[in-house]
Amino acid sequence: MNLIPRTSIVVYLKHMKHERQIRKYGHIVHSNRDRKFVIMYVNEQDVDQIVHKLMQLKYVRHIDGSPYKYLKKTYEKEKHEIYN
Protein backbone atom coordinates (compact mmCIF):
# COMPACT_ATOMS: atom_id res chain seq x y z
CA MET A 1 0.00 0.00 0.00
CA ASN A 2 1.48 3.32 -1.08
CA LEU A 3 0.74 6.46 0.88
CA ILE A 4 -0.01 9.44 -1.30
CA PRO A 5 1.38 12.73 0.06
CA ARG A 6 -1.50 15.09 0.78
CA THR A 7 -1.75 18.66 1.96
CA SER A 8 -4.55 20.67 3.48
CA ILE A 9 -6.01 23.88 2.11
CA VAL A 10 -8.52 26.28 3.63
CA VAL A 11 -11.19 27.50 1.21
CA TYR A 12 -13.25 30.55 2.22
CA LEU A 13 -16.69 30.64 0.63
CA LYS A 14 -19.28 33.37 0.09
CA HIS A 15 -22.12 31.01 1.06
CA MET A 16 -21.92 27.63 2.75
CA LYS A 17 -24.56 26.18 0.43
CA HIS A 18 -21.73 25.68 -2.07
CA GLU A 19 -19.92 23.27 0.23
CA ARG A 20 -21.31 20.31 -1.70
CA GLN A 21 -19.81 21.48 -4.99
CA ILE A 22 -16.38 21.78 -3.35
CA ARG A 23 -16.39 18.07 -2.37
CA LYS A 24 -15.33 16.90 -5.82
CA TYR A 25 -11.95 18.68 -5.49
CA GLY A 26 -10.78 16.88 -2.34
CA HIS A 27 -11.66 15.34 1.01
CA ILE A 28 -13.42 17.77 3.38
CA VAL A 29 -12.21 17.40 6.95
CA HIS A 30 -13.86 20.37 8.66
CA SER A 31 -16.35 23.07 7.78
CA ASN A 32 -17.34 26.12 9.82
CA ARG A 33 -20.69 27.65 8.99
CA ASP A 34 -20.17 30.80 11.08
CA ARG A 35 -16.88 31.79 9.45
CA LYS A 36 -17.76 30.21 6.10
CA PHE A 37 -14.67 28.14 5.46
CA VAL A 38 -13.85 24.54 4.59
CA ILE A 39 -10.64 22.66 5.40
CA MET A 40 -9.91 19.94 2.89
CA TYR A 41 -7.13 17.53 1.93
CA VAL A 42 -5.93 17.29 -1.66
CA ASN A 43 -3.12 15.36 -3.33
CA GLU A 44 0.14 17.27 -3.08
CA GLN A 45 0.96 16.86 -6.78
CA ASP A 46 -2.43 18.30 -7.83
CA VAL A 47 -2.52 21.32 -5.48
CA ASP A 48 -1.69 23.95 -8.10
CA GLN A 49 -4.32 22.71 -10.54
CA ILE A 50 -7.01 22.41 -7.86
CA VAL A 51 -6.31 25.87 -6.42
CA HIS A 52 -6.46 27.35 -9.92
CA LYS A 53 -9.82 25.65 -10.57
CA LEU A 54 -11.21 26.71 -7.19
CA MET A 55 -10.20 30.35 -7.67
CA GLN A 56 -12.18 30.46 -10.91
CA LEU A 57 -15.39 29.61 -9.05
CA LYS A 58 -17.47 32.69 -8.26
CA TYR A 59 -18.45 31.54 -4.77
CA VAL A 60 -14.85 31.17 -3.51
CA ARG A 61 -13.47 34.22 -1.69
CA HIS A 62 -9.87 33.13 -1.20
CA ILE A 63 -7.72 30.09 -0.43
CA ASP A 64 -5.00 29.60 2.17
CA GLY A 65 -2.46 26.80 2.08
CA SER A 66 -1.40 24.80 5.09
CA PRO A 67 1.81 25.92 6.80
CA TYR A 68 2.32 22.41 8.25
CA LYS A 69 5.17 21.28 6.00
CA TYR A 70 7.15 24.44 6.86
CA LEU A 71 6.86 23.94 10.63
CA LYS A 72 9.64 22.44 12.68
CA LYS A 73 8.61 18.88 13.57
CA THR A 74 11.55 17.73 15.69
CA TYR A 75 12.16 19.39 18.99
CA GLU A 76 15.17 19.25 21.23
CA LYS A 77 14.88 19.35 24.95
CA GLU A 78 15.58 22.88 26.05
CA LYS A 79 18.05 23.41 28.85
CA HIS A 80 16.79 25.78 31.49
CA GLU A 81 19.11 27.20 34.08
CA ILE A 82 17.73 27.61 37.55
CA TYR A 83 18.74 30.78 39.32
CA ASN A 84 18.54 30.89 43.12
UniProtKB/Swiss-Prot annotation:
It comes from the Bacteria. GO terms for cellular component: cytoplasm. InterPro entries: DUF2129. Its main location: cytoplasm. It is found in: Cytoplasm. Keywords: Cytoplasm. Belongs to the UPF0298 family. This is UPF0298 protein SAOUHSC_01072.
